[in-house]
Amino acid sequence: LYKIRVERKEGFINKTGAVVIPSSFDKAYNFKEDLAKIKNGSRYGFINKSGKTVVPAQYAKVSGFSEGLSAVKNDGKWFYIDKTGAKTIDVVCNFAYPFHEGLARIQVGTLFGFINTSGIIVIKPQFEGAYDFSEGKARVKKGDKWGFIDLKGALVIKPTYDFVRDFSEGLAVFRVGNERTGKWGFIDNTGKVIVKAQFDKVFPFSEGRALVRVGDFKNGKFGYVDKMGKIVVKPQFDSAYHFSEGLANVAVGVGSDRKWGYVDVAGKVVVAKQFSKPSDFINGLALVRI
């Protein structure tokens, strides 16, 4: 199903454009695990693909379902619910996040740790920063440097980088230096540098390609590299995104003159640059604005 907005209310259509769930929500989010988060007023709940309310809009905050559970908040307290809306886990924390690979990130004070699906803290809050697990590892911050832990909490890649991103397709982005002038590259899951820090910006791999920027934020150009760091689509775009279903949306021009189209993994133009706003292809369709 695809989200639509009509007269400030949101709902869903199918691939033929037929309305499946009328636009009756103040805010609707994409379906995850067959349920969609919705908002009415200041409260969140969940609906199924028939539009039936599964969890009434009663929570101040919700994370969305992941691995069958969603973190929710009411009256200043976080807990987890299952897809029937039943409470499954109580947790004492300042913030709770979705489950990934069997563990969920929590924030206690200023530190981050992880709980399991029984609500037991298995990695105690000790990191100044942390993200969700991906491919068996989570990026964490100790002091002012970033590294990775495994599912048992062991530091498997020491915190030596100024920034890192999640592992994707076996590689993780790292940065040496600050956000403005630092250089970016890739490491493998042992911490070995596969692509040295040489680009002005890089993004995680998707479908065997990673988006890179050569040049500064204002004047740089975007292209794509393979997993050895070889440029396979030369930096030529003023903006670009990752690949989805074999296509990536790319743009040339600035401001109101910017137009978006789509290229394949070889950089061949498949859809000419003509749109003012693009989105990823999902199940063969992409939402665009003319």
Predicted regions and their residues:
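Residue-level detector of conserved, function-critical positions
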Residues: L1-I290
